Swiss-Prot record:
GO terms for biological process: ergosterol biosynthetic process; farnesyl diphosphate biosynthetic process, mevalonate pathway; isopentenyl diphosphate biosynthetic process, mevalonate pathway. This is Phosphomevalonate kinase. ATP binds at residues 151-161. Phosphomevalonate kinase; part of the second module of ergosterol biosynthesis pathway that includes the middle steps of the pathway. Erg8 converts 5-phosphomevalonate to 5-diphosphomevalonate. The second module is carried out in the vacuole and involves the formation of farnesyl diphosphate, which is also an important intermediate in the biosynthesis of ubiquinone, dolichol, heme and prenylated proteins. Activity by the mevalonate kinase erg12 first converts mevalonate into 5-phosphomevalonate. It comes from Schizosaccharomyces pombe (strain 972 / ATCC 24843) (Fission yeast).
Amino acid sequence: MKVTCSAPGKVLIAGGYIVLDPQYSGLVIGLTAKGYASTTTLDDKCGTVRVKSPQFINAEWLYNIDWTVSPIRVHQIYENCELEKNPNPFVQLALFYVINYFFSTGRQPLCWQDLQVTLQVDNAYYHQPQLKPDQTSYPKFNFLNCTLGQVHKTGLGSSAAMITSLIGSLFLSLRRLTDDTGDKSLKIDDSTKVIVHNLAQIAHCSAQGKVGSGFDVGAATWGSCIYRRFDPKLIEQLLVPYDEQIKNINFSTELRKIVSKKWSDVVPFQLPATYCLLMGDVAGGSSTPGMVKKVQQWQKENPEESKNCFDDLYSRVLSIKNCFLSSESLDSELQSQFRSIRRILQRITVEAKVDIEPLKQTNILDNIEQLPGVIGVGVPGAGGFDAQFCLAINHTEIIENVIKTWKDDGVVPMDVSPAFDGLAVE
């Protein structure tokens, strides 16, 4: 039996940096660029899981499950000693948390069947090579001829989409194996989404070695939403290194208890049909954790000034949300709020000495912002050199004008659009 789940990418159009603080919220748009995970249940009962990602070189991982320790251990097996070791903390920890959610320490469960997983993501997540002379388009899941560690990302949330779709697919597969009530449905209702979301947040944070804002996993699970961060203390005791075995006889019980509850309010949101969202790839790339640390250091050194900036940013987020929810046309108000957000982020860029909106981005964004019909522009999320977004009135001539201007400035328009739905069964 095969179960395939998909999860969307994300763009945080309002709420960068303040979304790290649970007292604020951010406006996240889910994207049609998706991550896909297909889990096939095999007849074998060897206690193994094989995972492959065919878009990359040396992207296959084999894991063995040790049922006798607590928590249950998932460790990588290297079949070919000639190949360079290729640990994948995101995959390994996703398996670790889902297996410990469903099973308790002891013997291998009688219901267990080995699993084979295939991971794929849409092309928009990565910078693509130039088309060959005989090509007019890329295959849906283009082979990138590099390792996973060498790929250049576009900043749309590939790791969050991958880990959420993977945990969703594993969760549904193992639920079918362990459910003795006869219910073999593949439904993803809200209660299932809560558990998958929480498991994905824990696995994602463990793999990154820190508790981030989580809005990327939030969008991957819930789709477009008004996102408020959960309290990091909820999960700190459950974070584990992928390559170390911890000892905790109550781990599975504690995990099940914590992930079964909703951690924070996530309000579904849909971009009004009168607007369109465009994304542009600037072929750069930024280290989000490094940028966040610099801003946090600036906050510590300038508590009053930074709080005023963040409060001002949040007031703009709320205004944008209210404009979108209003039945009236408030284009000029939206334009004013998006421009104010840019000015605040430009100020933080200078004062915190971090490239939230680098000069190269500013010059291009200024050109786009002045075009007729453009509502707002910016560098999403933590900013940097990953991508740009443009919110515009949904009219063909306006869209074509934005795309032409981007191309003239060396920005590649991305084949993505807003997605309202989150995690889904394909």
